[in-house]
Amino acid sequence: MNQQVIIFDTTLRDGEQALQASLCVNEKLQIALALERMGVDIMEVGFPVSSPGDFESVQTIAKQIKNSRVCALARCVEKDIDVAAEALKVADAFRIHVFLATSDLHIESKLKKTFENVMEMATQSIKRARRYTDDVEFSCEDAGRTPIDNLCRIVENAIKAGATTINIPDTVGYTTPYQFGGIITNLIERVPNIDKAIISVHCHDDLGMSVANSITAVQSGARQIEGTINGLGERAGNCSLEEVIMAIKVRQQMLGVYTNINHQEIYRTSQLVSQLCNMPIPANKAIVGSNAFSHSSGIHQDGVLKNRETYEIMTPESIGLKEIQLNLTSRSGRAAVKHRMEEMGYQDKDYDLGSLYEAFLRLADKKGQVFDYDLEALAFINLQQQEPEFFHLDNFNIQSGSNVMATAAVCLVCGKELKSEAATGNGPVDAVYQAISRITEYPIELVSYQLSGKGQGKNALGQVNIVVECFGRRFHGMGLETDIVESSAKAMVHALNCVWRTEQVKKEKQRIQQNTKEMV
């Protein structure tokens, strides 16, 4: 009888560490809801003690998610565990994930402790976490380089203390599949109480073997896989969940295991994470890359036309990838747009129909016909920009040419006031940014600028993703228009609104603290 493999997603914790700018609470919630629809069993959504922002994100997601178990990370430190429990207590069901380094290198160089000290710290921390929940995971950080005798000892000890899931991370992506599978086999054969816990694996991709290591671990007896959407993560990233999930589905007969994932949601979730995290998906990325189901060789094309199974081991439809269609124009009504979104798998709560339809009409007037990829791009932008705006781009005008300094005049709505400025720059985009900076008077530094095309032909959309630094923090902005300069301007305005909201939160916290002091 096939056994279930639990899917543990850590996109919002481990995956976020790879981003140039942190996600805001609303963006994290959108990803969490998508993961819930996809059917992940556990989602690790943050490290609450690390910052007030992470605490707020974990708490917000814990309130909203009903069909997946929400998890938060904590070091083997009392405060970490208590803060994690406080953030999670609003959830219907939650897990606390405590971790501690177990390799000689980490214990001696980083922790400056002995292995016996580490054993005691793990025991006390697991027991403390069990005060709050009966679902506690313990991770042996750098397990891949931990002597097997020590690993067996601390795993047995952790289970005795109350850990219900034992996670074996290949923290630096060092092991090979044969070696990693052997570690799991050793634990199953040598730890007497191993049957009282689920063995989990968390593989990094430094040598490009994270998915292979995870699959080999499952063949050896592991029953939980940890990873991220699109393989996001520090350095070379984590185990790519869409890859490992589809490997289990396609090779289910050989592996003898299954997952509870809704495979039809894989592509859409991957696209959402890519857009919100400003991390483009390589064209040749397995499962979700734009070339994953394309065939250019004449021999391959002939085979696919005769029988798709000749060169396709899975179908695009199996991951929710629909054929691109051309069916909407400026004459299409709101109901038609809503119907098309439903056909693509979107639910009402995934987007705001009013703002989406307004953006659709503007685009349809420019392009004439709107494709599915256009509509999805607009939906993603609306998801990211649906929070109240303080700054709004009213209009702009540019003058540029060869051997001429670019000049831009920009009008911004700032609250209820219309402000305008002009500036020169090294090209039209830089000139627009200089003018916007003069209006807002924010000390903004452009860290990253990326331009990508959405669609085909002369009316393709230009998507601009930027990262700016302001007041010591980084913020992400996104713009989408047929005009690249306008798209660039809207990306900057989007980032500025993120800055403004952050500053408002800071001022409100200061006001509350001041009132508290006065009351005392």
Curated annotation (Swiss-Prot):
Ranges where the Pyruvate carboxyltransferase domain occurs: 5-267
Main enzyme class: transferase
Subcellular location(s) of the protein: Cytoplasm
PROSITE patterns the record matches: AIPM_HOMOCIT_SYNTH_1, AIPM_HOMOCIT_SYNTH_2, PYR_CT
EC number: 2.3.3.13
UniProt GO BP: L-leucine biosynthetic process
Cofactor(s) listed: Mn(2+)
Key words, A-Z: Amino-acid biosynthesis, Branched-chain amino acid biosynthesis, Cytoplasm, Leucine biosynthesis, Manganese, Metal-binding, Transferase
Ranges where the record places region Regulatory domain: 392-520
Principal subcellular localization: cytoplasm
Residues where Mn(2+) binds: D14, H202, H204, N238
Domain of life: Bacteria
Catalytic activity: 3-methyl-2-oxobutanoate + acetyl-CoA + H2O = (2S)-2-isopropylmalate + CoA + H(+)
One GO location term (cellular component): cytosol
Molecular function GO labels: 2-isopropylmalate synthase activity; acetyl-CoA C-acetyltransferase activity; manganese ion binding
Pathway(s) per entry: Amino-acid biosynthesis; L-leucine biosynthesis; L-leucine from 3-methyl-2-oxobutanoate: step 1/4
Subunit structure, as described in the record: Homodimer.
PANTHER family, alphabetized: 2-ISOPROPYLMALATE SYNTHASE 1, CHLOROPLASTIC-RELATED, HOMOCITRATE SYNTHASE-RELATED
Protein family according to the UniProt entry: Belongs to the alpha-IPM synthase/homocitrate synthase family. LeuA type 1 subfamily.
Summary of the function given for this chain in its UniProt record: Catalyzes the condensation of the acetyl group of acetyl-CoA with 3-methyl-2-oxobutanoate (2-ketoisovalerate) to form 3-carboxy-3-hydroxy-4-methylpentanoate (2-isopropylmalate).
Name of the molecule in the record: 2-isopropylmalate synthase
